[in-house]
């Protein structure tokens, strides 16, 4: 079975780097390109059409909605399945994105594991043109509270962990898991590290080394 080809588009380079690392770690996914503005998205789509496009709503030059309009005009075949990302849950924008072909609309911050699940779902379900009709703005996904995500980011920055190193992503996941289940602190090497390793398709020892 061939891997799901994913194109990432977001103007936050740090976020894109984390997203690329996580998706690339999935056994059935491959990141074929990244774009930091709307024009780059259109150019990359002209060169190669991905199975799934992860598209941020707010970007320079062309915003996410303008990119969706461009995609419609390009008449790509096959059409990529599109997951929209945004930090704002405005209903009118959500409706417009769905009308223009978005299959899912996800609010930041979100759990990357859930995003991976959504990618698999839209690939294995009906074509996007049919699937979009069942998507409603009210179903916008908010996985984690913004305050929690902001607090975790602040903590990691205070510790001095650079965002580009591999341990950064593992550390974020560890803090989130412990926040949701403090008892994990009593079984860090036996449960916490192995659970993180499963999510990133690596080993517990690798997770431990990267965090340390």
UniProtKB/Swiss-Prot annotation:
Q: Which residues are modified to 4-aspartylphosphate?
A: 56
Q: Which residues form the Response regulatory domain?
A: 5-123
The UniProt entry lists the main location of this chain as cytoplasm
Locate the DNA-binding region by residue range. 194-212
Record's comment on post-translational modification: Phosphorylated by KinA and KinB.
**InterPro entries in UniProt:** CheY-like_superfamily, Sig_transdc_resp-reg_C-effctor, Sig_transdc_resp-reg_receiver, Spo0A_C, Spore_0_A, ST_Response_Regulator, WH-like_DNA-bd_sf
Top-level lineage group: Bacteria
The alphabetical list of record keywords is: Activator, Calcium, Cytoplasm, DNA-binding, Metal-binding, Phosphoprotein, Repressor, Sporulation, Transcription, Transcription regulation, Two-component regulatory system
Extract the NCBIfam families matched here: spore_0_A
Function noted in UniProt: May play the central regulatory role in sporulation. It may be an element of the effector pathway responsible for the activation of sporulation genes in response to nutritional stress. Spo0A may act in concert with Spo0H (a sigma factor) to control the expression of some genes that are critical to the sporulation process. Repressor of abrB, activator of the spoIIa operon. Binds the DNA sequence 5'-TGNCGAA-3' (0A box).
Q: What is this protein called?
A: Stage 0 sporulation protein A
Q: Which gene encodes it?
A: spo0A
